[in-house]
Regions:
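Conserved aromatic-histidine-acidic binding/catalytic patches
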Residues: 98, 238-241, 337
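N-terminal Rossmann-like or analogous alpha/beta NTP/dinucleotide-binding catalytic cores
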Residues: 2-87, 94-222
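Conserved nucleotide- and phosphate/pyrophosphate-binding catalytic cores
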Residues: 254-475
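Short alpha-helical patches at coil-to-helix transitions and adjacent helical residues
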Residues: 103-107, 180, 243-247, 391, ...
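Alpha-helical recognition segments enriched in aromatics with Gly/Pro capping
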Residues: 121-128, 153-168, 172-330, 348-350, ...
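A short, small-residue-rich loop immediately preceding and capping a beta-strand
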Residues: 87-91, 236-237
Length: 475
């Protein structure tokens, strides 16, 4: 049987051959062939890769790895020599009912560790959720009730299943070990930690300076989170880059407990689909939920700005770096249309969550609905001068200036359903669509226009606003 290195190499050779010869990834058997290769890769046994190869495969998708990639390779080597599994910790506080693809980035790495033969411990922070992670917050937040937590937990496991083999993973609640802890035990942990380590955090300093509130519970959040690492004796912890300071506290508390500090693997926080620079977030409406229907996963990713393609391909797919580099090279040389590359991304993510057939059905439906429509060919479209009406909100343009939508309420409902869009078309046939949110609907048109300047200011671009069937051209 071929080893994993040889299998990965053969898989990559086959995929890159398709990329070099495919006339168009938007349709046809070439896209299906690539999706089948990637589906096989998601389940590929990686246990016989060398420790260095394994460490490099993990590091390729991380924003920061501490202490270093060589030390990860050493840990992998030692585990192999001792015939033991590394314990890989990954936790989420159930502060919301939905998980989005931004949360899936460390899950994808966790899957790789599973396929290397290691043990992933998926920790649901039912205790820490009551405190609430203070990272990046500018104000305090009411604690969650037990009912809130149980409601949010209901769909967690179902949503993350595409990324984990739960037959080889533990699914734990940190109340198992945190609820019984005594006050003397907790004080014993705290007395070994300098307060200055927490007060040096920029987010804490900002909140204290502004007088917006910082509870003692929030101050010790990272310490409580560290007790999870101590309990399971974590070798590795996965998390988003925003969790880096919390994970560094985990290393310190583990060392104080006489344990070897865990290796930190921090993944980047991916930008939201709206292309404004804000990170993916349900509150901003610029997210792709793991509970979305196939057509919605596909459609939301197809609406993402072209410039997000490199980031999304590296973070969300099983494509290897040379394959991504080739895709971007072919796109830059116009040998592949950007919409074809975006179709591959959308189909691959839909396939990961819902399966190959669902991805194909979503692609077919999207193509039938959108791909043949060019607004530049639509006759008698009302034109509105942005310089003249830029102070009006997007909603006011449709309701008051153009009179194409009967009310602001209807426009907001359309926006919440994903039907409010900014569409930019170039003379070469390119079309880029940006989904606008309810917030955008209440924002001045000039501000929305400026926020998407990289899209609307391309050479020869014609720009349109669509609300349901209502259409406006912006000049």
């Amino acid at each position: 049987m071929l080893n994993a290195s040889t299998r990965l190499g053969a898989s990559s050779d086959a995929l890159m051959k398709i990329l070099r010869t495919a006339p168009d990834l938007r349709t046809g058997p070439d896209l299906r062939a690539i999706l089948e290769i990637l589906a096989e890769r998601r389940g590929m046994d990686l246990s016989d890769l060398s420790p260095t190869e394994q460490a490099e495969l993990i590091a390729a998708r991380t924003a920061q790895l501490l202490p270093s990639v060589p030390q990860l390779a050493e840990a992998l080597q030692a585990a192999g020599d001792e015939s033991r599994q590394l314990i890989v910790k990954f936790g989420i506080d159930p502060t919301a009912a939905d998980v989005h693809v931004g949360h899936a980035v460390p899950m994808i790495i966790a899957s790789r560790f599973q396929r290397m033969g290691h043990r992933v411990v998926f920790i649901i922070g039912d205790i820490t959720a009551k405190i609430g992670d203070p990272t990046g917050r500018t104000a305090d937040r009411p604690p969650l009730s037990d009912e809130d937590i149980q409601h949010n937990l209901a769909t967690y496991r179902q949503q993350v299943t595409p990324f984990f083999d739960f037959e080889r993973a533990d699914f734990r609640f940190n109340s198992e070990w945190l609820a019984p802890i005594t006050l003397p035990q907790f004080i014993g942990v705290l007395e070994k930690l300098p307060l200055s380590a927490s007060l040096q955090r920029e987010d804490f300093r900002t909140r204290l300076a502004e007088g917006s509130g910082l509870s003692m519970a929030e101050l010790v959040y990272s310490v409580v989170m560290a007790l999870d690492s101590v309990e399971i004796t974590a070798d590795i912890e996965l998390g988003g880059l925003d969790q880096l300071l919390n994970m560094q506290m985990c290393r310190r508390v583990m060392e104080n407990a006489g344990q070897k500090p865990e290796i930190i693997i921090a993944t980047g926080l991916i930008e939201g689909t709206d292309g404004t620079g804000a990170k993916m977030s349900k509150s901003k409406g610029n997210y792709v939920g793991l509970a979305f229907e196939p057509k919605d996963v596909f459609g939301k990713l197809m609406s993402a700005a072209d410039r997000l393609l490199p980031e999304y391909l590296r973070a969300l797919t099983e494509l290897l770096d040379p394959e991504i580099d080739l895709l971007l090279e072919l796109m830059a040389s116009r040998e592949l249309h950007p919409m074809g590359v975006k179709t591959l991304l959308a189909a691959e993510m839909t396939s990961t969550i819902h399966g190959l057939d669902a991805a194909e059905e979503a692609r077919t439906g999207f193509t039938a609905q959108f791909s043949q429509k060019r607004y530049s060919d639509t006759p008698d479209v009302l034109q509105i001068d942005v310089s003249e009406h830029g102070a009006a909100t997007i909603g006011e343009l449709f309701v008051k200036v153009a009179g194409l939508v009967p009310s602001q309420n209807q426009l907001r409902r359309t926006a919440s359903g994903g039907g409010l869009r900014l569409v930019s078309e170039t003379p070469d046939g390119g079309q880029e669509t940006v989904a606008l949110t309810e917030t955008d609907a209440n924002t001045a048109a000039a501000e929305v226009y400026a926020a998407h300047s990289s899209v609307v200011e391309r050479d020869g671009a014609r720009n349109f606003l669509r609300c349901g069937r209502a259409l406006i051209e912006l000049r």
